[in-house]
Amino acid sequence: MSSSSPTGQIASAADIKQENGMESASEGQEAHREVAGGAAVGLSPPAPAPFPLEPGDAATAAARVSGEEGAVAAAAAGAAADQVQLHSELLGRHHHAAAAAAQTPLAFSPDHVACVCEALQQGGNLDRLARFLWSLPQSDLLRGNESLLKARALVAFHQGIYPELYSILESHSFESANHPLLQQLWYKARYTEAERARGRPLGAVDKYRLRRKFPLPRTIWDGEETVYCFKEKSRNALKELYKQNRYPSPAEKRHLAKITGLSLTQVSNWFKNRRQRDRNPSETQSKSESDGNPSTEDESSKGHEDLSPHPLSSSSDGITNLSLSSHMEPVYMQQIGNAKISLSSSGVLLNGSLVPASTSPVFLNGNSFIQGPSGVILNGLNVGNTQAVALNPPKMSSNIVSNGISMTDILGSTSQDVKEFKVLQSSANSATTTSYSPSVPVSFPGLIPSTEVKREGIQTVASQDGGSVVTFTTPVQINQYGIVQIPNSGANSQFLNGSIGFSPLQLPPVSVAASQGNISVSSSTSDGSTFTSESTTVQQGKVFLSSLAPSAVVYTVPNTGQTIGSVKQEGLERSLVFSQLMPVNQNAQVNANLSSENISGSGLHPLASSLVNVSPTHNFSLSPSTLLNPTELNRDIADSQPMSAPVASKSTVTSVSNTNYATLQNCSLITGQDLLSVPMTQAALGEIVPTAEDQVGHPSPAVHQDFVQEHRLVLQSVANMKENFLSNSESKATSSLMMLDSKSKYVLDGMVDTVCEDLETDKKELAKLQTVQLDEDMQDL
């Protein structure tokens, strides 16, 4: 009977199961419950399994331990699934074990269960974690276990059972270490529910509204509000350091980032944004506390003003309209851009902003200016009793250069760029004659203290071919920032009132009615088309010239007390353009015949301009004259052949004063050589009579009609000088600078009553010009 007894069959089945060594997951769970039942009848609980412990592994180990101790009932329960004939007995035995387990404590310790949950969470086995949690019995030991609750919340989120997730998170107060994970579960569950309801992904605003609508429960939140990823404690720490130091060092930033838990970039951006809000209080409401975006202003530029002159903008979007309604004599340079600026009666357009100035300021391409009666602005240079000269070295292209930036597209006169052409008008108070007069100038108070530069050690250059060599008698005054550049150009580009020179502009004859004070200005483009303005009324001593480029340029002839001169320029390469005042004899008529020659370029049509200043008590009439035909002007000039294009524009000047000058600015550059040709007027120019070296007085220029001799300037290459323009041996630089020096020079008696002054030399040889032998003595005319 033993062979047919159920006990023998169970034992044989257990032996077969142990020999095969195969158990399923369900059998493991059954064995787990059997172990729990066996513990109720006195079996010791199994030793804790090593970490991590899987549910099947734990059940298998428990079954083996119980089998070794002789627990035949546990082994029979594991093999009962394979025995069809013992189904009824095994089922009864299973119910008995389950009832025993409900009445007995948990077989595994809470720490063992928490370890298994953490292992499955870290491994990402959420399905196995769900089966393990389902297999755990109801026990008071597991109630309130935070690891178990966190695992249940994670499984509920994974399975999409969000109400159970919310119930778990709101029912238990979790530790702060678990807050970040549980907060993400809370928000992601809310986002997913909203996306399912709306049928579309959520944007940043939608997520923000959901966070406001469903705030975090206090069980997973410390109650400290976070503003733009910055907690209140972090923001307070940043504010405290900001009160002490607005510009913390990198070490302080790193320390603050460590304290607040923020990154170094967040700390730096917070300080930048805070400084920006303090500078612009009106934008505080529109700016975020710290959105991670860098500030628009660089920290290194804080508190430092830009002392360098600003070049003109090359934008051609529009032309600024200027309204001139003053009886003063200011010079306006039109700003290029979209801004519409209207100037008042006595203002200067300074880099696009209106600067109130006193009587008759002159603006010359810079941001430093001089105010005073009949003030002259020479970009930081004080020219009260001095004469400045523009010295640029050769080898310049035909483009206009302003502070090293090409201005071809600004001052170009091609017909395609002509978008709008306007002539500025100004009405005169009364019908008076148009006359011009410089007188003895007034010393102007400069905003920047200037230093006098003495010319020392300059060797004299002998004149060649019977020509005259130009030098100057008065020192140059410069500011403490050194020489400031003024736009200059080679290839016969012209200076108008010491301001901007440009070569492509063509101006047909200008006729002035001496009795009515009207001026008719007509301009022609490079392709022959002509823009003619209506006859306008000008004030006394004012002439307006307008360019054909989209950026109109306004010029005025200086009034009483103003000085025409150009400013020293350095940094360019080897060309020289100068503006010089020529004394005109008393009661002498000067017929200024302008010519331009030796121009090498492609399609450039230079204009040799001449401004003549006479006494205000006399008339200055420009007789109508003719220019070259547009077809002749528009011919392309070959690079290899210099072309002479004389302009038959004559001017008649009647003067009865000793302080009358004719400004000659028609310099032409001989490229490839160090010899600069300055063609004088072809008729009625005064011949300079040389005088003794130590003689000081007024020369008497002899006037004859056939004076057509061409004077040449011999250039002396010397070392470029530094900012303070001190002529010592330590101030030499690498680049070369062209200086003017001669044995004979033009008399400059317009600034003061004296005609000549002796220039001292210190017998120092600075440079040599090719094969020309340099002299050491300087003479006066």
UniProtKB/Swiss-Prot annotation:
The keyword Nucleus applies. SUPFAM superfamilies: Homeodomain-like. GO terms for biological process: anatomical structure morphogenesis; embryonic cranial skeleton morphogenesis; fungiform papilla morphogenesis; generation of neurons; inner ear morphogenesis; male gonad development; male sex determination; male sex differentiation. One of its GO terms (cellular component) is chromatin. The modification Phosphoserine is found at residue 640. Belongs to the SIX/Sine oculis homeobox family. Interacts with EYA3; acts cooperatively with EYA3 to transactivate target genes through interaction and nuclear translocation of EYA3 protein. Transcriptional regulator which can act as both a transcriptional repressor and activator by binding a DNA sequence on these target genes and is involved in processes like cell differentiation, cell migration and cell survival. Transactivates gene expression by binding a 5'-[CAT]A[CT][CT][CTG]GA[GAT]-3' motif present in the Trex site and a 5'-TCA[AG][AG]TTNC-3' motif present in the MEF3 site of the muscle-specific genes enhancer. Acts cooperatively with EYA proteins to transactivate their target genes through interaction and nuclear translocation of EYA protein. This is Homeobox protein SIX4. It comes from Homo sapiens (Human).
